[in-house]
Design a protein with these regions (language model features):
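Bacterial N-terminal signal peptides that target proteins for export
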Residues: 1-10
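Bacterial N-terminal signal peptides
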Residues: 9-20
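Bacterial Sec-exported substrate-binding components of ABC uptake systems
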Residues: 22-28, 329-332
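Short, glycine-/small- and polar/acidic-enriched structural segments
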Residues: 25-175, 179-185, 198-202, 207-208
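Pocket-lining segment of extracytoplasmic ligand-binding domains
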Residues: 88, 167-258
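Ligand-binding clefts/hinges and TM-proximal coupling segments of bilobed small-molecule sensing domains
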Residues: 139-154, 234-265, 307-313, 317-322
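Secondary-structure end/capping motifs
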Residues: 222-303
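Conserved C-terminal helix/tail region of periplasmic/extracytoplasmic solute-binding proteins
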Residues: 295-334
Length: 334
């Protein structure tokens, strides 16, 4: 009887140790951020630096991978648990056969500007002029197409010249070779310093578009839903922290951008404080817009459905449980 009692005590102790250690174990997670600029990557930096990943049981290793497409490719290859991505890259990865899904969002519109020569007086003046553009299927390409559509023009109304990435596009206009281009906040600032002007502020058009989002694999969702759930919660808290802790946010931006100019970071902070989505819910309408445009040059997109690219169960949970309302100290929405 004594032996039985002793065995029970030992079992209880061992069980307690196992349970206790399991609760303390953090899941090792590898996540790519795709820009070393002070934009949407800040949410990942913040979550790491202020301990939000750790709070939700994630032993996070952040990895810089230059570009959304490369991040998605690494995810599909099994090198990552999550990646930051632009919606277009997630769509392309899925259409190419990748078992991936968008699980949360940071920005649901296009934080782009159409900038050009001072001689361009209005958006209507873009008609017939030359534009420095990116290759089809990139976010910059979609931004150009949607900006034109938003002011009543089409891609056929301009002389599009494929130049490439942001520095090359800006240079083509600054040097006078082409008339206008599409740029993010940093490109806009550079262009304005060189004498270019903002012709269209796309954020003001509020065109739904899946810009920055967190993507994972279908396998991760099926086999480790709690890890995905924790990631989504951490990203939601990172957005809240960004919006409410300006000084900390800017200090972390300075760290990851290697001491970028404070004034420039202030401007970026103000812009993204408005752009970042509180409930981290992906924009289904934005994904639909992307598929409609992509269908013009990609037959696979014409047959695809929005639900093929997104899994909203985790962001739905945030809404239903009142997680977001609690963060922002407001009455629960239903």
């Amino acid at each position: 009887m004594r032996n039985s009692g002793l065995q029970l005590v030992i079992i209880a102790i061992v069980f307690g140790i196992v349970v206790g250690s399991t609760r303390g174990v953090e899941a090792k997670v590898y996540t790519a951020y795709i820009s070393d600029g002070p934009d949407t990557s800040i949410a990942y930096w913040l979550a790491k630096e202020v301990g939000l990943f750790k709070k939700h049981g994630l032993d996070m290793e952040l990895i810089f991978i230059d570009g959304s497409s490369r991040g998605v490719q690494s995810l599909i290859a099994g090198d990552l648990t999550f990646t930051d991505a632009v919606g277009t890259s997630a769509i392309n990865g899925r259409l190419a056969g990748g078992d991936i899904a968008i699980v949360s969002s940071l920005v649901n519109t296009l934080p782009y500007y159409i900038i050009g020569k001072s001689a361009i007086k209005s958006p209507e003046d873009l008609k017939g002029r030359s534009a420095a553009v990116h290759i089809p299927g990139t976010s910059a390409d979609f931004a150009m197409r949607l900006a034109l559509k938003g002011v009543g023009l089409s891609y056929k109304d301009i002389q599009a010249v494929t130049v490439g990435g942001a520095p090359a596009r800006n240079a083509a206009v600054i040097t006078g070779r082409l008339d206008f281009t599409v740029a993010t906040d940093s490109g806009k600032i550079e262009g304005e310093k060189a004498g270019l002007k903002v012709i269209i502020d796309m954020a003001k058009l509020k065109i739904p578009f899946q810009f920055s989002c967190t993507v994972t694999t279908g396998r991760m969702i099926r086999q480790n839903p709690d890890v995905v759930r924790s990631m989504v919660k951490a990203m939601a808290e990172a957005v809240h922290y960004y919006k409410t802790q300006k000084e900390d946010a800017i200090k972390i931006m300075q760290k990851y951008t290697r001491g970028q100019n404070r004034a420039a970071l202030e401007g970026t902070y103000v812009a993204y404080r408005e752009l970042l989505v509180e409930d981290v819910y992906p924009t289904l309408e934005g994904l639909k817009n992307t598929l409609e445009i992509q269908a013009s040059f990609d037959p696979k997109a014409a047959k695809a459905k929005v639900d093929d690219f997104v899994d909203v169960r985790f962001v739905d949970e945030l809404r239903k449980t009142g997680f977001i309302d609690l963060l922002y100290n407001r009455e629960r929405t239903r």
